[in-house]
Structures are given as structure tokens and as C-alpha cells.
């Protein structure tokens, strides 16, 4: 009896109708989308300010989304998210419309997956690492397509030992994404995970669906996430959305070049306030770190500051403690760039 063909799924349209069936008429927007795992540190707040300024200065809405799908890490998601929102308000950052929570949008993610060409994947992270070459940027290892080549019988056998994740059956190896500093750049794409093996929608799926449905057409984030931009842009196009323009900022670090994180001791806004530093001082420092005039109210900068042309993607920058009284023991190699705050103003 001949072996079953590994082509198990019907060929679906390259572009689904998900966007047209789920999207209403929405004005363009920027966004800030924290995960409620801990309080926002200065690096997070700097990204939020940059995203808010870029949106407001280009005539866009600004939306806030809580990315709370990781059940293991967001046990106290409600309380932490409330703290994060208060911190944004304390700095003078406002947003349009209700705050969206990913945990309340599971049906939308399921609908998106239903229209895509997918296959089950049984590989563990260790197996993927062993089957791939050295990782690319940001320690990303493209999936080698192991489970895509399985026969029906092989998949049935693996189902008895492990629940599968769901992967996109990509038809491409590279895809182009647009970054305000890089311009149009082509990057590697692979069969990314859409649904984890515990049934949780994967980050890349949820963020693309939400950006598309919320009208987000500009995304400001740290440059270590650049490697995901081509994959997310491809998925957006497959779902019928126009991929956003990205603005990847220089990565802010603490002592020793370690990326800021609460687990590594990075200070949150409440830590600074408790040490005697006023919210307005924090805003002024964040503006200074972006190469902008030091103001206590970010609204003063909207439509009143010339945004400089983009420069090459910023490198790694360390925080300067001097404007904040040295309370956190950080330093700076250079003034942080304003290059990402550049786009033709919308009429």
C-alpha cells in the first residue's frame, strides 16, 4: 500500500477574508501593549512615551492593549494591569477607546487560524534547537519544518504521546517589513506557531490580529524585536490586513549591558516616586532620553517639536542616573536617539 502523502491539508487562498469580515471602519492608530507580568520599568515607559508621541504627532489615535494570554505568568494580571494603566496616566499619557484585553478575544484568534493553512507540530524546543543552525538575530531559530513533512500515520502516532501546537504553513522563506529607520528590509520567515500545545493563542498570532482589528498602522518597540517584524507582516497580509510600519528603538539596558527587567532589579515608576523623584521629573528625563526638549507634560511636545530625520538603527544605550539623582545607579553611553519619531505627518 503506498505511503500517505504528506500534503494533508487543502490548499487555501493565500489571503483570507478574516480582515473584511471582522474589521469595521477605524482610523489609523499607534499603540502600547504591555504584558501584565510586572510593573512598567523606565524602558517600558520610554517606549510608551515614544509610541504616544509618534501617534499623537501624526494625527493618529493611540490605543492601549493588555497582552494577558500567558496564563503561567499573569496570575495577578488584573492588579498589575491596573498599576500599569495608572503609571501611564501619571505621566500624562492618554488613550482612545477602551483598553483591550487579549484574554477576552479568544474567539477572534480561533477565527483567524481557521482560515489559514496550518499543520500540527509536535516538536519540543530542545528538538528544534538540535535541528537548527546557530540562532539569528535576537536568538531566534527558524523552524526547520520537521512536522510539516509528517504523514497522516506519523501524526496519529505522535498524537498518542504529545499534544501538538499549530503552525502556519508558510509558502515563503523571506518577507519584507517597513521600519522607519531601516526602510524596507527583507527578513527570514518560517512556519511560526499560531496556537501553543496547551491551546493558548501564540503571541505572534494575537498581536497581528489585534493590531489589524484596532487599526494599528505604526508599532514602536525595542530593536531586539526586529526579527519578528517580517513574520508578523507576512501573517498580517495573509489575514487581509495592511502590515504596520515599525519603529524599532535603541535597546535600553542597565549596568553591564543587561536589558532592563523587573526580575533584574529595574526600577518602576513607584520605586522612583518612593525615592523622592516626582512624576514630572521622570517625564522630563524620558523626553531627554529621546533627544527631545525636557518638559513635564508630554502634550507640550505634540505638534510643537520638529522630528528629526531617521538615522541608522540605534545601538544599545544605558540609562543616565544624573537627571534622576542617581537613585538607581545607571549610566549612559550616549543621548538616546529620536530617530524613530519620524514619519510624514498625516493631513
UniProtKB/Swiss-Prot annotation:
Which amino acid positions bind Zn(2+), per UniProt?
A: 121, 123, 143, 147
'HIGH' region (motif): residue ranges: 34-44
Its required cofactor(s), as named, are: Zn(2+)
Q: Does the keyword Zinc apply?
A: yes
- What are the annotated GO cellular component locations? cytosol
Q: Give the record's cofactor note, including how many are bound.
A: Binds 1 zinc ion per subunit.
Keywords assigned: Aminoacyl-tRNA synthetase, ATP-binding, Ligase, Metal-binding, Nucleotide-binding, Zinc
For biological process, the GO terms are: glutamyl-tRNA aminoacylation; tRNA modification
- What is the purpose of this protein? Catalyzes the tRNA-independent activation of glutamate in presence of ATP and the subsequent transfer of glutamate onto a tRNA(Asp). Glutamate is transferred on the 2-amino-5-(4,5-dihydroxy-2-cyclopenten-1-yl) moiety of the queuosine in the wobble position of the QUC anticodon.
Tell me which family the UniProt entry assigns to this protein.
Answer: Belongs to the class-I aminoacyl-tRNA synthetase family. GluQ subfamily.
UniProt xrefs under NCBIfam families: PRK05710.1-4
Tell me the protein's name: Glutamyl-Q tRNA(Asp) synthetase
Per the UniProt entry, what species is this protein from, by scientific name? Answer: Cutibacterium acnes (strain DSM 16379 / KPA171202)
Amino acid at each position: 500500500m503506498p505511503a500517505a502523502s504528506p500534503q494533508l491539508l487543502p490548499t487555501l487562498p493565500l489571503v483570507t477574508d478574516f480582515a473584511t469580515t471582522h474589521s469595521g471602519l477605524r482610523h489609523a492608530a499607534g499603540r502600547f501593549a504591555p504584558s501584565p507580568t510586572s510593573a512598567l520599568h523606565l524602558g517600558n515607559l520610554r517606549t510608551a512615551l515614544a509610541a504616544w508621541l509618534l501617534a499623537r504627532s501624526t494625527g493618529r489615535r493611540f490605543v492601549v492593549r493588555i497582552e494577558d494570554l500567558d496564563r503561567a505568568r499573569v496570575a495577578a494580571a488584573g492588579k498589575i494591569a491596573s498599576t500599569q494603566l495608572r503609571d501611564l496616566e501619571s505621566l500624562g499619557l492618554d488613550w482612545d477607546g477602551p483598553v483591550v484585553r487579549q484574554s477576552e478575544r479568544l474567539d477572534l484568534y480561533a477565527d483567524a487560524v481557521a482560515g489559514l493553512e496550518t499543520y500540527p507540530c509536535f516538536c519540543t524546543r530542545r528538538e528544534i534547537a538540535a535541528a537548527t543552525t546557530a540562532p539569528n538575530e535576537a536568538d531566534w531559530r527558524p523552524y526547520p519544518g520537521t512536522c510539516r513533512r509528517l504523514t497522516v500515520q506519523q501524526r496519529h502516532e505522535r498524537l498518542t504521546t504529545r499534544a501538538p501546537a499549530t503552525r502556519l504553513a508558510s509558502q515563503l522563506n523571506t518577507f519584507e517589513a517597513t521600519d522607519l529607520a531601516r526602510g524596507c528590509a527583507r527578513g527570514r520567515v518560517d512556519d511560526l506557531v499560531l496556537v501553543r500545545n496547551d491551546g493558548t493563542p501564540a503571541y505572534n498570532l494575537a498581536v497581528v490580529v489585534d493590531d489589524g482589528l484596532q487599526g494599528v498602522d505604526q508599532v514602536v518597540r525595542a530593536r531586539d524585536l526586529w526579527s519578528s517584524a517580517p513574520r508578523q507582516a507576512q501573517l498580517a497580509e495573509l489575514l487581509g490586513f495592511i502590515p504596520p510600519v515599525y519603529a524599532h528603538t535603541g535597546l535600553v539596558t542597565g549596568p553591564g549591558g543587561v536589558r532592563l527587567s523587573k526580575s533584574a532589579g529595574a526600577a518602576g515608576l513607584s520605586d522612583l516616586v518612593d525615592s523622592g523623584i516626582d512624576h514630572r521629573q521622570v517625564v522630563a528625563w524620558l523626553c531627554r532620553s529621546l533627544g527631545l526638549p525636557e518638559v513635564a507634560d508630554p502634550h507640550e511636545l505634540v505638534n510643537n517639536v520638529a522630528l528629526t530625520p531617521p538615522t541608522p538603527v540605534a545601538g544599545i544605550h544605558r540609562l543616565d542616573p544624573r537627571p534622576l539623582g542617581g537613585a538607581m545607579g545607571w549610566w549612559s553611553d550616549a543621548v538616546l536617539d529620536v530617530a524613530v519619531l519620524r514619519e510624514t505627518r498625516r493631513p
